[in-house]
């Protein structure tokens, strides 16, 4: 099978896929923020949540439903900052995934990735990582929302966790973005083979 990638390009393709997968998994999982409410563990992502309180009519009290899911609507996301974070991080993950899949195709298709295409792909990866980084930076601005305050002991505020902890998915998303920005962007510059010029 012919490849349009150099040896460095193959490493770039694999690292691109790993960084994109890491960021996408972290973005989708609702484990960015951990806390507890009514004695049950609660976790949040940007657009998903695990465990939420509902009013039990039969017992006339609040009980925790221990299941994970998306918010019912985009407006249901607890804060404007988290809505922006969802859009920005989602766009960044989409860009990283697009480049990663193109890079993997370059392992099998000749003349798909030239030096110029590799450099453009690296630029797109840098932009994707930057968007995800911006999303990660915006996320703490939503810690003052009522839902988060209920979970974090009513003492959380912007950039103040209260009784909550940052979850593994937040680190996962940020690590994938950092790898894309720092490592993959650099490797992309050396990924494509020099194009052959055919005299037609």
UniProtKB/Swiss-Prot annotation:
One GO cellular component assignment for this chain's record is:
membrane
Q: Which UniProt keywords apply?
A: Membrane, Signal, Transmembrane, Transmembrane helix
Q: Which cysteines are joined by disulfide bonds?
A: none
- Where are the membrane-spanning stretches? 84-104, 123-143, 166-186
* Compartment(s) of residence: Membrane
The lineage is:
Eukaryota, Metazoa, Chordata, Craniata, Vertebrata
Q: Which InterPro entries match?
A: LHFPL
PANTHER family the UniProt entry points to: LHFPL TETRASPAN SUBFAMILY MEMBER 6 PROTEIN, LIPOMA HMGIC FUSION PARTNER-LIKE PROTEIN
For this chain, the family text in UniProt reads: Belongs to the LHFP family.
Q: Does the keyword rRNA-binding apply?
A: no
Does the entry feature the keyword Metal-binding, yes or no? no
- State the signal peptide span: 1-23
Identify the Gene3D superfamilies for this entry. 1.20.140.150
Q: Which domain of life is it from?
A: Eukaryota
Q: How does it sit in the membrane?
A: Multi-pass membrane protein
Protein name, entry field? LHFPL tetraspan subfamily member 6 protein
């Amino acid at each position: 099978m012919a490849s349009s990638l150099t040896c460095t390009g193959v490493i770039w393709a694999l690292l691109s896929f790993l960084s994109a997968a890491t960021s996408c998994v972290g973005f989708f999982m609702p484990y960015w923020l951990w806390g507890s409410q009514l004695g049950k563990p609660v976790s949040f992502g940007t657009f998903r949540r695990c465990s939420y309180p509902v009013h039990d009519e039969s017992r006339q009290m609040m009980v925790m439903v221990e299941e994970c899911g998306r918010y019912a609507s985009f407006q249901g996301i607890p804060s404007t900052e988290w809505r922006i974070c969802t859009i920005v991080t989602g766009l960044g993950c989409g860009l990283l995934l697009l480049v990663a899949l193109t890079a993997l195709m370059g392992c099998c298709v000749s003349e798909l990735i030239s030096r110029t295409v590799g450099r453009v792909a690296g630029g797109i990866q840098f932009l994707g990582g930057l968007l995800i980084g911006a999303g990660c930076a915006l996320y703490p601005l939503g810690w003052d929302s009522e839902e988060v305050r209920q979970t974090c002991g009513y003492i959380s505020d912007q950039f103040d966790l209260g009784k909550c902890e940052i979850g593994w998915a937040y680190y996962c998303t940020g690590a994938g973005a950092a790898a894309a920005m720092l490592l993959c962007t650099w490797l992309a510059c050396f990924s494509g083979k020099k194009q052959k010029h055919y005299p037609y």
